[in-house]
Amino acid sequence: MTEMNMYWRTDRPKEGFYTTQLASHPQRPVRTFLPNDYQPRYPYPLVVLFHGHGGSEDQVLRLAPKLSRRNYICISLRGPREVGIRPDGRVGFAWDDVNHEDETEEYLMRAVEETRRTYHVHSERVFLAGVGEGAGVAYRIAFRMADRIAGMIALNGAVPLPNGRPLFNLRTMRGLKVFMGHGIANTDATFARARRDYRLLYAAGADVQLVPYRTTHELHPEMTRDMNQWIMRAIHANTDLLLGKR
């Protein structure tokens, strides 16, 4: 993400969940998980979470403390379309598949900017992570912003292929870090599809890892553990590169 003048808060708010209202998107709040023992002098990696079909920003942010209670600031975004009531009685949302990349990217950028105004976020350690349909959104944005993010995670999702063609530009894909966690019994997006996506991204030059899990479209408990380890490796690899280590 680009640098900007930041004046984040210097106190130490408690670990927990917070809500931010964006003036630019009043109907689409941003939920934040702040880690334990937040240190305002430390630039935290930021993980942006996109929920699955019928989910919500509250529901997907529950992954944050399972990912790590110390390592990251996490935010979650709300899809633009209501799709009924969830089993917990709350409204579920979805992401429109086509022709909304500009709007979603604008929403993301405003959410990241507001988070960076409030908390100390490392500008070069922003990761996108999506679940199910949200993984498709993360892919779309990552392909457009490959040079502005540190990497992306897709859990039980698929690379969007409108008209049978990928959305990415080969010139921007080289070196993009991608973690794919996928259930081998997933019938919504099959594991065979995940393998094809892996080969597609690998051939385009992405630094991609595909990890299978014994689950369906439901998230496996080990996914967040592996996500945490993958993000930390990605951060350390970039640090070593900057320091000239091999």
Where do the model's predicted regions map?
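Alpha/beta-hydrolase-fold serine-hydrolase catalytic core, especially in secreted/extracellular enzymes
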Residues: A204, R233-R246
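Short, surface-exposed alpha-helical segments at coil->helix boundaries
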Residues: L61, E105, M109, Y139, ...
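Serine-hydrolase catalytic machinery in alpha/beta-hydrolase-like enzymes
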Residues: N5-V121
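Loop/turn elements at helix/coil->beta-strand transitions in domains of secreted/extracellular proteins
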Residues: Y44-P45, R70-Y72, S123-R125, D147-G151, ...
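Short, well-ordered alpha-helices that flank and scaffold nucleotide-derived cofactor binding pockets
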Residues: P65, F143-D147, R196-R199, A203
